[in-house]
Amino acid sequence: MISLFCSLLFSQSIVTQESYDSRFTPPEIGLPENMPYVKSLIWGKEGAFRKLNIGPETRIEELKLRRKMLQAHQWLGIITLAGLAYQYDVGKKLYDGDDSDYWESHYDKHKAMGYFTYMTYMSTASMSFFSPPARKYDNNMSSIKFHRRMAALHFTAMMAQPFLAKKAVESGKRYNELMDAHLKAGTVAFFALSLDALGITFFK
């Protein structure tokens, strides 16, 4: 009798567990339609990560990983924006001013912050770029589409900044011209990233 009771109890626990699993475990989710081209090169059916067997084994696990990566993307973006605000403010004062004391005390800080923000920016971008695809994509205008368009703008400006600064130092004759372009690239990067942050926060 005890053995029968234990068997019934055990079988009931299995049924209960199966019922729980079927109710609370979502069915497998396929790859989304209209996946962005670059994302499909990485995560598509014939994407690089599929061929190299990189990443989670199921789409559900992929979506969990995507959420974690995008959360890191957001926090790194905030850090980058704060760093860019400081760098832009100091850089503009260095460019506009003629105070040698300010230059001597802040030039190295501006340069160091430039390396820091470039590193955090690229880390931020990589979190989004290499994250698994979303559950779905649509053609309607949204905060995500606005984010992608602004990202193309501030990414280009961030790539141009160090190149222009390096060329300005190397080319004495075009120093003022290249430094002016460097400042403009920094302005575009800072304000585009600021608008991007506002858009992703308030635009639905």
Q: What do these predicted regions represent?
A:
Residues 100-109, 141, 173-181:
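Extracellular loop and loop/strand-boundary signature of outer-membrane beta-barrel proteins
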Residues 1-2:
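Bacterial N-terminal signal peptides that target proteins for export
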Residues 5-108, 123-138, 204:
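N-terminal targeting leaders of membrane proteins
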Residues 66-95, 109-132, 145-169, 179-203:
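Hydrophobic alpha-helical membrane-anchor/signal-helix detector
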